[in-house]
């Protein structure tokens, strides 16, 4: 049995399906935080400052005053507000229909929800770009980021800086608002639903599918999925990701730890291609 058929068999015969989606899945769908050519085109000022990808902005310390908010406005508008559900996520949803599944994603692009996945079946483990909260935490209120972005865009300068007067501020106390990411009620609820799913499926057969997960947020999906596989007698684990020889990691992206190798399969291929092949197989057998 080849890898695709083995994966399809596990997907269709297991009592439960746990899906992990990393940056590689959204990259296969068309959203890449590592695209240096696009970054240079869209953010020449940051490129000149030595920042060459969206990934590098996460740890960048050399922001000019007001520049990070200007960058975030344009970046979030492009990734969250202007990008619809991408076809690959529609395909993944169609593939999982009929399964008792739960999906965990480290991506903040909201693609699962845009594609119509039931919110109760999705945990956005890193949160999303969609809300702002008070930096002083004067309350637990959450604010939709879209109106603030729309109000800021006309005031972004060529170097991406934005004057303080055009930054978002808390309507209660006046402190700056900041992206919420994980500090939301939705995140807390998703975390609880994830743990409930793991408890419910503890003694059952489960297919664990990991798409496009590397090492940037290994503690969110990669390491927990390996642990869950090792703990469960009836687990079957599939790691689907392309390798990156230029990576500084000592472990290859598709590598499987030896202790769980007997119930795991590494598929060193593009996540999108694998999902499309699985969906074609499902349709052929319908």
Where in this protein do the model-derived segments appear?
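Conserved catalytic alpha/beta core of Sir2/sirtuin-type deacylases, generalized to analogous enzyme cores
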Residues: 1-286
């Amino acid at each position: 049995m080849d890898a695709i058929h083995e994966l399809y068999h596990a997907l269709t015969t297991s009592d439960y399906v746990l899906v992990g989606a990393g940056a590689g899945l959204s990259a296969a769908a068309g959203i890449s935080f590592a695209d240096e050519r696009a970054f240079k085109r869209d953010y020449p000022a940051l490129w000149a400052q030595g920042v060459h990808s969206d990934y590098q902005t996460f740890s960048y310390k050399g922001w000019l005053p007001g520049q990070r908010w200007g960058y975030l406005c344009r970046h979030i508008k492009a990734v969250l507000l202007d990008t619809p559900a991408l076809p690959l996520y529609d395909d993944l949803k169609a593939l999982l229909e009929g399964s008792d599944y739960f999906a965990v994603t480290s991506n903040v692009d909201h693609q699962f929800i845009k594609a119509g996945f039931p919110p109760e079946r999705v945990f956005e483990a890193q949160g999303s770009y969609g809300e702002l909260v008070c930096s002083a935490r004067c309350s637990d209120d959450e604010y939709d980021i879209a109106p603030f972005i729309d109000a800021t865009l006309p005031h972004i300068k060529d170097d991406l800086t934005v004057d303080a007067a055009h930054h978002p501020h808390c309507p209660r106390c006046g402190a700056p608002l900041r992206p919420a990411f994980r500090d939301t009620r939705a995140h807390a609820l998703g975390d609880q639903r994830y743990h409930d799913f793991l408890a419910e499926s503890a003694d059952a057969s489960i297919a664990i599918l990991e798409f496009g997960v590397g090492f940037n947020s290994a503690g969110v999906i990669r390491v927990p999925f390996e642990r869950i596989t090792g703990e469960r007698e009836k687990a079957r684990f599939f790691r689907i990701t392309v390798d990156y020889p230029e990576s500084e990691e000592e472990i290859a992206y598709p590598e499987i730890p030896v202790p769980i190798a007997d119930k795991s399969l590494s598929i060193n291929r593009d996540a999108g291609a694998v999902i499309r092949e699985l969906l074609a197989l499902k349709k052929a057998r319908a």
